[in-house]
Amino acid sequence: MDNEKGLLIVLSGPSGVGKGTVRKRIFEDPSTSYKYSISMTTRQMREGEVDGVDYFFKTRDAFEALIKDDQFIEYAEYVGNYYGTPVQYVKDTMDEGHDVFLEIEVEGAKQVRKKFPDALFIFLAPPSLDHLRERLVGRGTESNEKIQSRINEARKEVEMMNLYDYVVVNDEVELAKNRIQCIVEAEHLKRERVEAKYRKMILEAKK
């Protein structure tokens, strides 16, 4: 039978919810076969991050030039910085039958939904907004004013979870990782995804 086209897996949620930590845990698992689509951003690199591994870090001018060339599936400006997903890698990798994993901001996920309505959208939620505030303070990288700005934005983003197919609470990283992997596995078994393949198999068997 022909190879099944890959899934586009979109993980997003409020800043500070732990998207990057959960994504790293998923890709540390030897059983993970997803291809990670690295996002591009104009924000400053954080301690421990690697250019070309965690993000492609670009200047604002370079990023805006790529916008003009229509080189993004999605892009958004969030708290003064651009974030975007390069388009060609995603399309090529899915056509090869690989699942592509995107870790992006909520505004970006809205754009992806319009262009890839069949993608799998997972909202990573904090146990509470107080818990989220503690995580942001614990980073020690931002002012109180910036943290409050992120909390205000998080409130709006939580209200937008109806745009997603699944909600995973990040109360513990390993549990969140396992939940996401189970969701992806179940998605591959949906009748809508496999029916055409098996109908083709039956028709070929009758020849």
Curated annotation (Swiss-Prot):
Residues 6-185 form the Guanylate kinase-like domain. It is found in: Cytoplasm. It catalyses: GMP + ATP = GDP + ADP. ATP binds at G13, P14, S15, G16, V17, G18, K19, G20. GO terms for cellular component: cytosol. It comes from the Bacteria. Keywords: ATP-binding, Cytoplasm, Kinase, Nucleotide-binding, Transferase. Its EC number is 2.7.4.8. It holds the Pfam family Guanylate_kin. The keyword Nucleus does not apply. GO terms for molecular function: ATP binding; guanylate kinase activity. The keyword Amino-acid biosynthesis does not apply. Essential for recycling GMP and indirectly, cGMP. Belongs to the guanylate kinase family. This is Guanylate kinase.
